[in-house]
Amino acid sequence: MKQSAVVSKITQPYAEALLEMAQKYDIVETVNNDITLILNCLQNSTKLQQFLANPLVKKSSKKNFFEKTLAKEIHPYTFKFLLLVIDRGRISCLEIIAQKYQSLILKLTKTELAEVVTAVPLSSEQEAALNNIIKELTNANEVKLVFKIDQNLIGGFIINIGSKVVDASLLGQLLRIGNYLGLETV
């Protein structure tokens, strides 16, 4: 079994248990906000990731760190969940658990996450129109758009929704024409 499959098998039950607890106490949105905060902290600090992943750092030190930094910022149940993850020796997987929790929330709320890559920033009208189109295509209740700028596209856009890609960029069209004509590069 691949390492990513093993990690997924380990982390999924934690994310599911966190969601189940949040639903039981009707704090799904609060816990989601807490998880977003934790995920931002992890993604913005490689030192924090290294600290949490280091097996030589005692569990009590990791608990003390969270007690001093997050205990007053997050819901007590989210904090208890963090302590449980530390006690079980899975704190190095916290980022993956958090991402899986957010994926479960998206499924629960029938929200589709779409990454939109454009050459230039879109106007608010264009964003709203794109949001409505993606909603119709995916039958989602909500669409969460994440925008990235790539000036190499020249014009148009690329939309990534799960494993689906819609390439409506000028660069994509030029590359397809080049492939059709048998050219190596455009």
Curated annotation (Swiss-Prot):
F(1)F(0) ATP synthase produces ATP from ADP in the presence of a proton or sodium gradient. F-type ATPases consist of two structural domains, F(1) containing the extramembraneous catalytic core and F(0) containing the membrane proton channel, linked together by a central stalk and a peripheral stalk. During catalysis, ATP synthesis in the catalytic domain of F(1) is coupled via a rotary mechanism of the central stalk subunits to proton translocation. This protein is part of the stalk that links CF(0) to CF(1). It either transmits conformational changes from CF(0) to CF(1) or is implicated in proton conduction. HAMAP family: ATP_synth_delta_bact. The keyword Transport applies. Transmembrane segments: none annotated. F-type ATPases have 2 components, F(1) - the catalytic core - and F(0) - the membrane proton channel. F(1) has five subunits: alpha(3), beta(3), gamma(1), delta(1), epsilon(1). CF(0) has four main subunits: a(1), b(1), b'(1) and c(10-14). The alpha and beta chains form an alternating ring which encloses part of the gamma chain. F(1) is attached to F(0) by a central stalk formed by the gamma and epsilon chains, while a peripheral stalk is formed by the delta, b and b' chains. This is ATP synthase subunit delta, cyanelle. GO terms for cellular component: cyanelle thylakoid membrane; proton-transporting ATP synthase complex. Keywords: ATP synthesis, CF(1), Cyanelle, Hydrogen ion transport, Ion transport, Membrane, Plastid, Thylakoid, Transport. It comes from the Eukaryota. It is found in: Plastid, Cyanelle thylakoid membrane. InterPro entries: ATP_synth_OSCP/delta_N_sf, ATPase_OSCP/d_CS, ATPase_OSCP/dsu. SUPFAM superfamilies: N-terminal domain of the delta subunit of the F1F0-ATP synthase (SSF47928). GO terms for molecular function: proton-transporting ATP synthase activity, rotational mechanism. Pfam families: OSCP (PF00213). Belongs to the ATPase delta chain family. PROSITE patterns: ATPASE_DELTA (PS00389).
